[in-house]
């Protein structure tokens, strides 16, 4: 078969229309044609740049959060420091450097686990972190995490988990599915599949026809698993992504390639596919599991952790161009009209521990 588009078309011809989540899963993880198997997504030469690759300041603030959370939990020894979807290892590199600089005791107590399904990226991560002379445990599933106190980070991971979409038609919710028209192009259709009962049926009944609602069962399962684990072993987690604090409607499925948005049906497997994260649902799941949970905008979080103070330190004695770059990086990470407002930070813990104070 020549490409993923033809493979998906054949599936639809044989089995009928597919769900949005099936389409996303194939586009991202198909063993032969999937995006994560065939493309190089990260960095300026890739399809997108994540916050850790904009500036070391981002990872340093996460490192401060980790250390402060560890102290708030009573300085457990040993403890698990884990990241889900570590990319090229840039964020964990900055976190470990920060912890090592501020507390050798915490650094020695940390056992590093990177949850990564790409063998190529896992090798790159280990190579990047080799200088710390710590064993790097590369695992593919959260279930492989030992039962020690856990401090977990996931940056721009949740947006990649598949979603299903529902559209209101003539007062009823129907599932959006994908089929092929007479011209051989992918199109959305409304299929007679009801909105799951867990999706706030009463609230959803108030919206007009044409409204789209996105449901992300894998995100919700992930949140239940992490929250339950934290209650059992103690610890804290930090999930960072773009999305809304409150329940939101609309089609947020998007394709990105070479830093530009593309048609989601154009060349599946060659573009990154993501959607906005439903943070209100995730927070409620954490609370139901017995965790403390709070949502902050990324800019607010970074300022709380000492972004400006650290930036001033970093700029001392540096050239004017480098100082300008630091200011530009802060603007991009924390400004409300860039990443500061769109990106949210969900912090949750087994104890009533709010976002720790800066050092």
PLM feature spans:
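Rossmann-like AdoMet
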Residues: 1-84, 88-141, 145-149, 306-309, ...
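Generic recognition of stable, solvent-exposed alpha-helical segments in well-folded globular domains
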Residues: 3, 19-22, 53, 57, ...
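Short, glycine/acidic-enriched loop or turn micro-motifs at the edges of active sites
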Residues: 119, 158, 244
């Amino acid at each position: 078969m020549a490409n993923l588009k033809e493979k998906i078309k054949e599936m639809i011809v044989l089995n009928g229309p597919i769900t949005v989540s099936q389409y996303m899963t194939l586009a991202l993880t198909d063993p032969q044609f999937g995006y994560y198997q065939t493309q190089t997504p990260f960095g300026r030469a890739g399809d997108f740049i994540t916050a850790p690759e904009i500036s070391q300041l981002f990872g340093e603030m996460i490192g401060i959060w980790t250390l402060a959370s560890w102290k708030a939990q009573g300085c457990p020894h040993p403890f698990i420091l884990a990241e889900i979807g570590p990319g090229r290892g840039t964020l964990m590199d900055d976190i470990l450097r920060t912890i090592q600089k501020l507390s050798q005791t915490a650094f020695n107590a940390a056992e590093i686990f990177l949850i990564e399904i790409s063998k190529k990226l896992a090798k790159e991560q280990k190579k990047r972190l080799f200088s710390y002379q710590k064993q790097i445990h590369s695992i593919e599933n959260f279930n492989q995490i030992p039962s020690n106190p856990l401090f977990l980070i996931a940056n721009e991971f949740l947006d990649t988990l598949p979603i299903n979409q529902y559209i209101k038609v003539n007062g009823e919710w129907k599932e959006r599915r994908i089929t092929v028209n007479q011209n051989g192009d992918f199109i959305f259709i409304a299929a007679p599949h009801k909105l799951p009962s867990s999706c706030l049926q009463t609230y959803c009944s108030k919206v007009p026809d044409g409204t789209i609602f996105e449901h992300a069962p894998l995100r919700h399962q992930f949140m239940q698993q992490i929250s339950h684990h934290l209650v059992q072993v103690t610890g804290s987690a930090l999930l960072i992504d773009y999305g809304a604090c409150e329940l939101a409607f609309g089609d947020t499925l998007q394709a990105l390639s070479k830093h530009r948005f593309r048609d989601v049906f154009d060349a599946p497997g060659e573009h990154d596919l993501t959607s906005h994260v439903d943070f209100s649902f995730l927070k409620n799941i954490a609370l139901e599991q017995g965790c403390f949970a709070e949502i902050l905008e990324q800019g607010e979080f970074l300022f709380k952790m000492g972004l400006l103070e650290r930036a001033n330190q970093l700029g001392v004695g540096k050239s004017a161009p480098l100082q300008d770059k630091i200011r530009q990086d802060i603007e991009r990470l924390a400004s409300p009209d860039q990443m500061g407002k769109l990106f949210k930070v969900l912090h949750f813990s087994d104890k009533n521990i709010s976002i720790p104070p800066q050092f």
